[in-house]
Swiss-Prot record:
<keyword id="KW-0694">RNA-binding</keyword>
<comment type="function">
    <text>Multifunctional enzyme involved in mRNA capping. Catalyzes the formation of the 5' cap structure on the viral plus-strand transcripts. Specifically binds to GTP and displays guanylyltransferase and methyltransferase activities. Has affinity for ssRNA but not for dsRNA. Capping activity is non-specific and caps RNAs that initiate with either a G or an A residue. Together with VP1 polymerase, forms a VP1-VP3 complex positioned near the channels situated at each of the five-fold vertices of the core.</text>
</comment>
<keyword id="KW-0946">Virion</keyword>
<keyword id="KW-0548">Nucleotidyltransferase</keyword>
<dbReference type="GO" id="GO:0004482">
    <property type="term" value="F:mRNA 5'-cap (guanine-N7-)-methyltransferase activity"/>
</dbReference>
<keyword id="KW-0511">Multifunctional enzyme</keyword>
<keyword id="KW-0808">Transferase</keyword>
<dbReference type="InterPro" id="IPR011181">
    <property type="entry name" value="VP3_Rotav"/>
</dbReference>
<keyword id="KW-0547">Nucleotide-binding</keyword>
<dbReference type="GO" id="GO:0005525">
    <property type="term" value="F:GTP binding"/>
</dbReference>
<keyword id="KW-0945">Host-virus interaction</keyword>
<feature type="region of interest" description="GTase/RTPase activity">
    <location>
        <begin position="559"/>
        <end position="692"/>
    </location>
</feature>
<dbReference type="GO" id="GO:0016032">
    <property type="term" value="P:viral process"/>
</dbReference>
<keyword id="KW-0899">Viral immunoevasion</keyword>
<dbReference type="GO" id="GO:0019013">
    <property type="term" value="C:viral nucleocapsid"/>
</dbReference>
<comment type="subunit">
    <text>Interacts with VP1. Interacts with VP2.</text>
</comment>
<dbReference type="GO" id="GO:0004484">
    <property type="term" value="F:mRNA guanylyltransferase activity"/>
</dbReference>
Length: 692
């Protein structure tokens, strides 16, 4: 949903799903904002005049803080605003469109510069374009700044990690004869046009920046947080990602099995991932990372990293780094290293005509670099080393096995070790063991760290999309959330039809209901839209009950003087309106249903004097489709006489009106045979009665 103000009438009447809202001067801006937010159209247009613009501005402020984008636009921008999804930074007047119409121009857009130095352009019928962070400025004016952030990065990453599974599917096989990159890209673009843009992924790139900046302990970081981690590399923070495989954890046996992973060169991707893994590993030591790279060429990703890290390079080919030594690294250079990280990615160009001899030389070279790594770590400056290894029988430190995909899978992997690791017992590994690991395990996260334990102080903690994981006990997660005082945490919402459902997407997650928690009253429980509003953003995408929704738990977010500022009733009735105006026996079904359950006999004034609260009923009965409204917080504040709102339309509900609404929601679920909904209504009633 988006709300657009226009001083001039534009050519907008031909757009589907657009509603022209007439500002009612008889109502306050609160009432107008509420009526606007509950329109079922996705685009609401308001024609402005000097007589109403000040009141409209107040309504727009209220809508934006509730995560519903509302802004005055130029007439010549009506097209993109009505046809594109976007994330709006309403505090700074910046609009981030997530717009793929560049497909019309046969463009393929990436946000990592090193892709330009591959042969991708030879494999695709598209023009390959690079934009830093994927950001293309479309307009820069006094009213606002417009960017487009949509890219094809996700298609590249799916190709690298998931192409075998995707191209083995029946749908792909029916459409294409060949399993190649060109067809893969075409297929992924078809899926994008058929279903939806990856809105959450694109929007989160924008909105997670503020939550990251405010936090010092990050739980569950993954690669999508790389930009924020880089932007905050000089501030104090650590991460707990429960990620990383130790050498001693490897099992099984295998043999050499060369495989081409990609039609185009992804060696630079692998090197970039390796480098970031090392840098963020050192960052977790509470040190400012820096790096010496031995064997750096061509290093097409290094120039963009110089702004974040000091990077010293050694290679006989020229590399654009902070300081480049145009020669090979020698043993005499060991004592000259002053960076706290060293990345060794060297393999001499041995004669390939005699593979046995070459194999012997590769193993000897590997041992030599391992010894150099020990000497570097025994010195004063170096904290961690990431070095190239090969599958062989050898005794090595029990470090981390790092294996990001590269163009060809052969015999190589990487070993991450630090000062403490090399002091511990070494591990004997066999060639067979390492081949099995190389053939079956691929790294997919640059953040390596231990597991976070759900105890201790929570100040400064941000935990997005991870604490629901079944590695944590569900009751412990609830206890943790009830005392949580960090920036924000999330748990997966149960919008299935199975009580205590465990959802398996990328990981196994427990599911929760807002009624599971007993948080302080200044903590807001809301949806992604509500979370966006709290952190200064608004989003156009409507919530979908797709099994991948999270409850955002945000401490100290409540506006104690005005409940409506964040996670309020704005938009609460949209789903109800849609159902009543398209499916039910009468548009008054909501009023009639609640009064019938409440035992009201005279229905004459049911739409004006209902026995049950419509707000409370809608918040419970339709939570799957919009749980932005913090109903649990509202119930607690309301009953304790602590509820405050700056509104001329609010009327305090009686206990009977609230109780009747909860009972009506329970009956609604009962008639649907919905056990989860019944459980939710039952828990909500317990919360209310406990307050009584």
């Amino acid at each position: 949903m988006r709300v657009l103000g226009l001083f001039e009438r534009g050519n907008n009447l031909n757009f589907a799903d657009t509603y022209i809202y007439t500002w009612n001067k008889q109502y306050s801006y609160h009432e107008n904002a509420f009526l606007i937010s509950n329109q079922v159209a996705t685009t609401i247009i308001i024609y402005l005049s000097d007589t109403i613009v000040n009141e409209v501005d107040k309504a727009f402020t209220l809508l934006n803080s509730n995560g519903i984008p509302a802004l005055v636009i130029r007439k010549d921008h009506i097209g993109i605003f009505t046809s594109s999804n976007f994330t709006y930074d309403w505090q700074h007047k910046i609009v981030y469109f997530h717009e793929y119409t560049y497909y019309k121009n046969n463009e393929f857009i990436v946000s990592d510069e090193f892709w330009l130095h591959t042969n991708i352009h030879e494999l695709l019928p598209y023009k390959l374009l690079y934009y830093e962070r994927g950001m293309r400025k479309l307009y820069d004016g006094e009213e606002y700044t417009l960017y487009n952030t949509a890219t094809d990065d996700d298609i590249l990453y799916k190709y690298i990690y998931e192409k075998d599974a995707i191209m083995s599917g029946d749908d792909y096989s029916e459409l294409y004869d060949d399993k190649n990159f060109r067809n893969f890209v075409h297929f992924m673009r078809l899926l994008r046009m058929r279903f939806a843009v990856p809105f959450d992924q694109l929007s989160n790139r924008v909105t997670r920046s503020r939550a990251f900046f405010k936090s010092k302990i990050h739980i569950g970081l993954r690669n999508e947080s790389i930009p924020q981690a880089l932007d905050n590399i000089n501030s104090q923070w650590i991460n707990y990602s429960a990620n990383g495989i130790m050498i001693s954890e490897l099992k099984g046996s295998g043999s050499y099995s060369e495989k081409r992973i990609s039609e185009f060169d992804i060696g630079q991707f692998k090197n970039y991932m390796n480098f970031l893994t090392l840098m963020f590993y050192i960052k977790n030591m509470k040190k400012r990372p820096s790096c010496t790279i031995i064997g750096a060429a061509p290093g097409y990703w290094i120039p963009s990293m110089k702004r974040y890290f000091t990077i010293i390079t050694y290679d006989d080919k020229i590399v654009d780094s902070t300081e480049h030594h145009n020669r090979y690294f020698s043993e005499e250079d060991i004592t000259k290293v002053r960076t706290n990280g060293v990345y060794i990615d060297v393999r001499s160009d041995f004669d390939k005509s005699d593979w046995k001899k070459r194999r012997q030389l590769v193993e000897e070279e590997t041992k030599r670099w391992l010894e150099i790594s020990y000497r570097l770590l025994e010195g004063k400056y170096v904290e961690a080393v990431l070095l190239k290894m090969t599958a062989m029988d050898i005794e090595i430190p029990d470090g981390y096995f790092v294996h990001f995909p590269t163009t060809y899978r052969k015999s190589e992997y990487y070993l991450l070790i630090d000062k403490q690791i090399i002091k511990k017992q070494k591990v004997k590994v066999t060639k067979s063991l390492m081949y099995n690991a190389i053939n079956t395990i691929y790294s997919d996260n640059v953040f390596i760290s231990g597991k976070y334990t759900l105890r201790g102080k929570t100040e400064g903690v941000v935990a997005l999309y991870c604490l629901s994981n079944t590695i944590n006990q569900k009751d412990k997660v609830i206890q943790y959330a009830n005392s949580f005082s960090g920036t924000c945490m999330t748990v997966r919402l149960n919008n299935t039809y199975e009580v205590n459902k465990v959802i398996n997407l990328n990981n196994a997650d427990y599911t929760f209901l807002p009624s599971d928690f007993v948080c302080p009253v200044n903590t807001v429980l809301t949806s992604y839209r509500g979370y966006a509003g709290v952190f200064g953003y608004a989003i156009t995408k409507d919530l979908k009950s797709d099994g991948n929704n999270h409850i955002y738990i945000i401490p100290n977010a409540r506006d104690e003087n005005n409940f409506d500022t964040f996670a309020s009733h704005l938009g609460l009735s949209r789903y109800s309106h849609s159902k009543r105006f398209s499916e039910s026996a009468t548009t008054m079904s909501g009023y009639l249903f609640r009064d019938m359950v409440s035992g009201k006999e005279d229905m004459g004034d049911t739409d004006k004097a209902n026995y049950a609260s419509g707000h409370v009923f809608n918040a419970i009965a339709h939570y799957r489709f919009d749980y932005t409204y913090d109903i649990v917080g509202w119930l607690r504040l309301h009953k304790n006489k602590q509820f405050r709102v700056k509104s001329d339309i609010y009327e305090e509900h009686t206990s009977d009106e609230v109780r009747n609404a909860i009972e009506a929601a329970y009956t609604y679920y009962l008639l649907d045979g919905d056990r989860v909904g019944k459980e939710y209504a039952k828990k909500i009633m317990e919360i209310w009665e406990a307050q009584v």
